[in-house]
Amino acid sequence: MKYTSYILAFQLCVVLGSLGCYCQDPYVKEAENLKKYFNAGDSDVADNGTLFLDILRTWREEGDRKIMQSQIISFYFKLFKNFKDNQSIQKSMETIKEDMNVKFFNSNKRKQDDFERLTNYSVNDLNVQRKAIHELIQVMAELSPAPKIGKRRRSQTLFRGRRASQ
């Protein structure tokens, strides 16, 4: 009976271990493929700290994290664009980009398209520069929190002070 328990426990471990391989997110395998292609597993990659992880650890509030994440995703989209003609890593980049779309953009295609359009604007294009400066005041107004609409309450001490002096 004792050996039967060991055999059953071993079989359970094998089954659970194999399920773990199939349940893994698809981007993990593709990220490993990109690591091999870019030799990103080498020890010298860790020199001088991380690019993004320390920044993400610093910011805990959801709004702050979204700002940082948007810049990081923008970087990855530009990186993938530079290697779009490389057939050996094309599938990996597409899989990861699709997963980013699901996780960051909530599968909202329009949101992703607008994001990519923003990241593709060239800062060196004179027409883009002129339009950006033309829209600057409105963009700055959008950055400010909306004013709270409502009546302001006057301090009761003002009225009490006047009554006392009269």
Curated annotation (Swiss-Prot):
The modification Pyrrolidone carboxylic acid is found at residue 24. The keyword Glycoprotein applies. One of its GO terms (molecular function) is type II interferon receptor binding. InterPro entries: 4_helix_cytokine-like_core (IPR009079), Interferon_gamma (IPR002069). It is found in: Secreted. It comes from the Eukaryota. Homodimer. Interacts with IFNGR1 (via extracellular domain); this interaction promotes IFNGR1 dimerization. This is Interferon gamma. It comes from Callithrix jacchus.
